[in-house]
Structure formats: structure tokens, C-alpha cells
């Protein structure tokens, strides 16, 4: 029987971004890609990101965190999911303990989370990575504020010249004049995600700047597809816009699921503030893993 059978999980969302939180502290088991896909295939535990808690391995941290996409691949960052993990660790009667701050160790580095209210949290996502080899890109670009990349006819591209940023995972942000909802991101997104310029694939965003403190965003999420919200993409969009002087260093980013406040501080850290919501709790059925061995 899978070590995940009968494990309790929390189904949550951050602005409609579907999150499952699974606590594996106290057990050595590492979720395998086929197990993540099996959990995602069940309507009760369907997720955009699976957030798995492990015992801390770094002094001064509260937990280690592994993040899975629906296709079983791992991600270095998920801002909306990190807020949900913070709620689980601070508010859930089974997992939780009273505190105002948490520090989590993810594949991308340390994530510091601060409580704003019972449901809202601020996540310090750390500094953005802006060099071409940090994002990473497949070839050198000395200026990543805009790179040579387009989709559509060469003389009339649908999207072109994105800014590229890593927030622990690679992002390409295309700035447009029209409402981002008018672009067929379900068709364009997977083509750009897998473009050879992105050796680790990329999250693809279409962004419209509506003022110096307001960005409207739609996101095709690497390994997950269209999503109602993506916290790391919102952070990347603010950084990309500020580098082009389209906005200041603080803005409200409006996604289909709602608003996030993104602040790129003078200390170079990007902080994201937004809500969480618990939808239900459940246990993983053993039958989910019958074909996942």
C-alpha cells in the first residue's frame, strides 16, 4: 500500500488557484511524479499545485516544502500555495500552531511568510533573478528586460518581446495594449512554454499596464495550464514592468481570481500579499495509487 493512502489533505485556494496541502512531516516518503498525477486526477483532490510539507532540513526554518504541478513535475516556487501552507501551519487545528511568522525552505530558497489577518498573508519571495543564465535561457541575452521572441506572423506578431524573470521558476511576460482576456492563451501558452529558448520550460503571462500601480494579468502556468491566479507570475510581472518603467515598484496585480499586492522593495526582495481560503479536508483513497506504483 502506498504511504500516501489514507493521508489527510487540505483542499484550498489562493485567488482561485487550486492548492492541495499535504503534510508528510515525520515520514521519509517523497511524493513521486506518478503519485502527484494520481492525486490531481481525483476530483476531490484536484490541484494546480500540490504543496508537500517535510521536516525542516535547514536550521531556523519551520518546514521543508516540495511543490508539484498537475503533470507531476516539480516547481521551485508557488506564491499562492505558500500562503495556503502558511494558513495550514498557523490556523489548521491538526497542523497548526500559534505564530505570526514562518520560514519555509523550498527548492528555490527560503520563503518568509508573515500573517496579515486570519486569511491574508505576505510572502517574501526573495530577490528576482534577472541574468539570462539564472532564468535560465538557452542562449545569452545581455538585456532581459526584453528578449527576441515572438509568436505569429513575423510582420504582425500576436505577442513579442517579453521581459523574462525568474522568481524561483522561469517567467516570460508579454506586455500588450488590449485586455489580456482577448488573447487565446490556451492555444498560445503551451507553444511558448515549450519554446527552445526556455530549457526548463516557462510560465507565460500576458500583461496590460492600466496605470503606474495597476497591472491586469493572465497566466499560462508551466506544467499546469491556464490558471485563475499565479503568485510568482504576478511578482514577475511587477518586476518586468518596473524594469521597463511602465510601473513603480509596488502595484496591484489583477488576475481572473482577484487581486494581489506586489512590492519590489529597496532591499531587492519581492513581497506578495493576498488571501487564502479553505475549501474542504479529506483523505487520500488507497485506490488512487493502485496504478501509480
UniProtKB/Swiss-Prot annotation:
Keyword field: Amino-acid biosynthesis, Cytoplasm, Isomerase, Lysine biosynthesis
GO biological process: lysine biosynthetic process via diaminopimelate
Protein biosynthesis keyword on record: no
Binding site for substrate: 17, 49, 69, 79-80, 169, 203, 221-222, 231-232
Pfam family, one: DAP_epimerase
InterPro entries: DAP_epimerase_AS (IPR018510), DAP_epimerase_DapF (IPR001653)
Pathway: Amino-acid biosynthesis; L-lysine biosynthesis via DAP pathway; DL-2,6-diaminopimelate from LL-2,6-diaminopimelate: step 1/1
Catalytic residues (UniProt): 78, 230
Site (Could be important to modulate the pK values of the two catalytic cysteine residues): 171, 221
Protein family (similarity comment): Belongs to the diaminopimelate epimerase family.
Protein name: Diaminopimelate epimerase
Protein's organism: Methylobacterium nodulans (strain LMG 21967 / CNCM I-2342 / ORS 2060)
Amino acid at each position: 500500500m502506498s504511504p500516501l493512502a489514507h493521508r489527510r489533505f487540505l483542499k484550498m485556494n489562493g485567488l482561485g488557484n487550486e492548492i492541495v496541502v499535504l503534510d508528510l512531516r515525520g515520514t521519509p516518503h517523497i511524493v513521486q511524479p506518478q503519485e502527484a498525477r494520481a492525486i490531481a486526477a481525483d476530483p476531490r483532490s484536484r490541484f494546480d499545485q500540490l504543496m508537500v510539507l517535510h521536516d525542516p532540513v535547514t536550521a531556523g526554518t519551520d518546514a521543508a516544502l516540495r511543490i508539484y504541478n498537475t503533470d507531476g513535475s516539480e516547481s521551485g516556487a508557488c506564491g499562492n500555495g505558500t500562503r495556503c501552507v502558511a494558513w495550514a501551519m498557523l490556523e489548521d487545528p491538526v497542523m497548526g500552531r500559534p505564530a505570526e511568522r514562518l520560514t519555509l525552505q523550498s527548492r528555490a530558497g527560503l520563503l518568509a511568510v508573515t500573517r496579515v489577518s486570519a486569511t491574508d498573508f505576505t510572502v517574501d519571495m526573495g530577490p528576482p533573478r534577472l541574468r539570462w543564465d539564472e532564468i535560465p535561457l538557452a542562449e545569452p541575452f545581455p538585456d532581459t528586460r526584453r528578449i527576441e521572441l515572438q509568436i505569429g506572423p513575423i510582420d504582425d506578431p500576436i505577442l513579442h518581446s517579453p521581459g523574462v524573470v525568474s522568481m524561483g521558476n522561469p517567467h516570460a511576460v508579454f506586455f500588450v495594449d488590449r485586455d489580456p482576456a482577448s488573447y487565446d492563451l490556451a492555444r498560445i501558452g503551451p507553444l511558448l512554454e515549450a519554446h527552445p529558448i526556455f530549457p526548463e520550460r516557462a510560465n507565460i503571462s500576458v500583461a496590460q499596464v492600466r496605470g503606474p500601480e495597476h497591472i491586469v494579468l493572465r497566466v499560462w502556468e508551466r506544467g499546469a495550464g491556464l490558471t485563475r491566479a499565479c503568485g510568482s507570475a504576478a511578482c514577475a510581472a511587477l518586476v518586468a514592468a518596473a524594469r521597463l518603467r511602465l510601473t513603480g515598484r509596488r502595484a496591484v496585480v489583477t488576475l481572473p481570481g482577484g487581486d494581489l499586492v506586489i512590492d519590489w522593495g529597496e532591499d531587492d526582495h519581492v513581497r506578495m500579499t493576498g488571501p487564502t481560503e479553505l475549501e474542504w479536508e479529506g483523505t487520500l483513497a488507497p485506490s488512487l495509487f493502485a496504478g501509480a506504483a
